[in-house]
Amino acid sequence: NITDEGLKYLSGIHTLNLCSNKNITNEGLKYLSGIHTLYLNWNQNITNEGLKYLSGIHTLYLNCNKKITDEGLKYLSGIHTLNLSCNKNITDEGLKYLSGIHTLDL
């Protein structure tokens, strides 16, 4: 599996799939801000704190991440397409942060 250390070499990538990667943490996400499309489904170590590094991404898949809550959504308002399906800690309260998103999957 890819670790945070390896992510710093991927800045020019257009689309990156890191689904179910147990070694990626919030620290590694700071290297991914220039990526167009990012898949982070089923990543158990990604929390609200890491989402602040992802605001410049065009398309983001965050399906099934148990540690993402309403509070973290405030960092995602500039994203064009966002998939948050199967995130049990996202409630009506968090939707106030997502009004500018073009395509949203809950």
Where are these regions (language model features)?
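The feature encodes a structural signal of leucine-rich repeats
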Residues: 4-8, 26-30, 48-52, 69-74, ...
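Concave beta-strand-loop units of leucine-rich repeat
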Residues: 1-2, 12-24, 34-46, 56-68, ...
